[in-house]
Structure formats: C-alpha cells, structure tokens
Design a protein with these regions (language model features):
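Bacterial N-terminal signal peptides
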Residues: 9-19
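Bacterial Sec-dependent signal peptides at the C-terminal "C-region" and cleavage site
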Residues: 17-27
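Iron-sulfur (Fe-S) cluster-binding modules
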Residues: 300
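Bacterial N-terminal signal peptides that target proteins for export
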Residues: 1-10
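Beta-rich carbohydrate-recognition and catalytic domains
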Residues: 25-296, 307-333
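Intrinsic low-complexity, intrinsically disordered segments enriched in polar/basic residues
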Residues: 4-5, 17, 185-187
Length: 333
C-alpha cells in the first residue's frame, strides 16, 4: 500500500492495575496519519450534505458477488435518515460514495417522525426530538454470510441501539428489538458478543442479535464515541468526551480475564488531538458539547478501528463532523 508519512503521535501507557490480578502493563502506541487530507469529505454526492460522522470500515468478504470495491466504509450524518456507504480498492483511496446509501430509516424500526419519538425530557417537539438513524458499527459474519450493522436512533423516549443484517452489504433488514443504549461498538470474547455503549456501559449477548444483558458502567457520563481493539484478554478502548477543549481521542485498556461484571478500565492517555487545519487545528479551542455540530470546529470525534494483515488502522471524524481521516496505530510491547 502506498503511504504518505506525516507527523506521528507517540505515547506510552504504563498502568498498574489495582484489581485482584496485581500486575504492571506497559505498551507503546504510535499513531501515524496516512494521508494529509480527509478520505471522506462533504458533498461527495448529491445527497450526503456536509455533516459526516460515525465511520465503520470492513473488507468486503469473498462471498459477496460483484462488490462495488474491496472496502466498504459506512458512516452517517449525526441526524441522518440513512446510513451512507463509500467504497474503494485501497484504504487510502480514492473513495467514492454510493449515493443511494444502505439502511434507510424506514427499514430500521426507528420512528420516522417526532412525535411519536421524544427527547430526553419526554417532549415530542423538544430540541432533542428528531428522527434519525446513525453511528453504524459493522461486522462481517462469515459463519452466516451476513453483514451485521448496529445503529442508533431516537425511539419513543431515549436514544437506543437496534441491529440490521444484510447479505450484500448494501440492502439491510432492520430488526425491531431494542438492544441497549446508543453507540454500540461490539467485539467477541469467550463465546459472547460484547458491546460498549455510550456512556461506557457494557453489554453482552449469546448470539449478538438479541437479548443483550446490561453490565458495568466503565466510563464517565461525558464519554460518547468509542472504538475497540482486542488483544488476548486485553481490550483497548479509544474514545472521545464531551466537555473536552479541544475534543480529542483517548485510550485506556480493560482486563477481560475477570468476571465481566467486575471489569474496570485503566487511567486514560491522550492519543490524538487536532494538529492540522483539515482537523480543525487552526480554529479556536472551545469546550465541546453533546449533539451534532454543523460548522467546522477544533475537535476530533468518532474513532473507529479496522484491522487487516496484522496492521491496525484508526478512522476518526475531523473538524467536529466535517470529514473522516485515516491513521495507522503501531503497537509495540
């Protein structure tokens, strides 16, 4: 893969776990931006507009016939009415969008108007009451030859997560069951599907499609978008937080060897903050707020992890919600 090399961020995590397993863990993480511009930008087609959030990337499996490209990158508008799709044959692009999109809100089992959906104050006409489907978390199931997509939206009350499935990665069927809180990021561990939701609440299910059980809350109420990287019994969590100035990407880890109800996270370490104009670094530093942002700001949001051939990639939203960028994560013991 052709790669352009830009300034990297180097950090070291050195944390002493204060748990029943008493050991020291040290890991060096280097994050390297691979291109000097977002790979996804506003107005790439006639439908998508300028708000860009929530990336999730897969390698298209061989059992999908006639794919648009080797890679499918799913993303959304923060207040979107459908899940967007971009495709490419190399990770660094060029990326093109599939203008029709994938899962539409009408297929998702989320309300298409408010009311009947309501915001957190139970107001069908309040500022948080808007129909949407957003923040895809997409996985390939080779066992069932399906693409599994977790999405969130506003239900009749709070924001929640549902799941949709597809045989081709484009046409999805939504499932009606509410699985849990919004912003699922899922991973496999000990024959369960686990999911970390906002704000840091863990869930698990025996089949990944239904009956998610709520477990411990591991993060502060300001935690929102997360991404997960599993290494044996250690889970790295990348995330951003409201009320940061600027909003940036953090990392911590969780020891998965204990009973899941006893899991705790390590202290956070900063991974990445805006450093270039296309990331918003030339804009004023302001405290980030919850919800959508429709103008460029000095913020990074929405981390997502993709792994291929032993390499780890980090996607993230730039300048608030103004594009998606690509970096590589280098892990050394």
């Amino acid at each position: 893969m052709h790669q352009l090399r830009f300034r990297a961020v180097v950090l070291t995590i050195g944390v002493l776990f204060l748990s029943t397993i008493d050991y020291a863990f040290s890991q060096t993480i280097r994050v390297e931006r691979l291109v000097n511009t977002p790979i996804i930008r506003p107005e790439m087609d006639g439908r998508m507009g300028s708000n860009i959030a929530g990336p999730s990337l897969i390698r298209v499996p061989d059992w999908i016939e006639n794919p648009l490209g080797r890679y499918y990158l799913y993303f959304s508008d923060h207040r979107g009415l459908y899940i967007r799709l971009a495709y490419a044959n190399t990770l660094t692009g060029p990326w093109r969008t599939y203008e029709s999109g994938t899962l539409q809100i009408e297929q998702s089992h989320f309300p298409t108007s408010c009311p009947p959906c309501r915001d957190q104050s139970d107001n069908g006409n309040g500022p948080g009451a808007y129909p949407h489907v957003a923040s895809p978390d997409v996985h390939v199931s080779n066992a069932t030859q399906e693409i599994i997509m977790y999405v969130h939206g506003r239900d009749i009350g709070p924001q929640v997560t549902r799941v949709a499935t597809s045989k081709d990665g484009i046409h999805f069927d939504g499932h009606p069951e509410i699985l849990g809180r919004p912003y699922f990021r899922a991973f496999q561990h000990d024959n369960f599907t686990y999911a970390l939701a906002m704000p840091g609440v863990m869930y698990r299910s025996s089949n990944g499609l239904s009956d998610f059980e709520e477990g411990p809350s591991l993060f502060t109420p300001d935690m929102r978008h997360s991404a997960l990287l599993k290494r044996g019994n250690r889970l790295f969590v990348f995330w951003t937080e409201r009320n940061d100035a600027p909003e940036r990407i953090w990392v911590a880890h969780i020891d998965l060897s204990e009973n899941w109800q006893m899991w705790t996270r390590s202290e956070p370490i900063e991974v990445l903050r805006p450093e270039f104009p296309w990331e918003g670094a030339d804009l004023p530093i302001e405290t980030s707020q919850g919800g959508a942002i429709n103008v460029p700001v000095n913020q990074l949001r929405d981390p997502a992890i993709y792994e291929e051939n032993g390499r780890v990639y980090l996607l993230y939203a730039v300048a608030g919600e103004r594009g998606i960028a690509l970096a590589e994560v280098h892990l050394t013991p």
